[in-house]
């Protein structure tokens, strides 16, 4: 998180099949050896004018000396409530998770699966920011790539992030293309396919 010392806001538009359908915005508050990040995510997928999939989510995470100590989120997915309450237990040196799809412990090298944090590309496990589930992941470096965003060209490192367990059902599998700006360690773009072509 020290890489993000000067950053106050990261705004991400969410595209599906080339059309903007929502946003995921991160707001940073820096203190003495602490960082707090608030995230607001909203999008709706419509088919013939009818909403077939929607997310409305708020999350709050806290870091002390670059280490995650707290995460809380509330999400409505198609009006179904999901949640995560996570805290760091110093005596066990573990994350304690109370989530809508997982209750238990996770190793402290697990990363919350949020796109502001480039450390997701180094982690072996990610914790779902919506439900608290813990998934093993494998990250592969594809190569250097020039990409264009909003009329600007960026030299990026292109990575593929996939689930370690390939036996998971397709809707539970991790399968993302991620483009990282190595200069400032910011993830510039994320793409995946699920009910259409998605980009953040």
Give a label for each model feature:
Residues 2-89, 119-200:
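Acidic, serine/threonine-rich low-complexity disordered tracts
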Residues 71-113:
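Hydrophobic, well-structured mid-protein blocks that either form specific transmembrane helices
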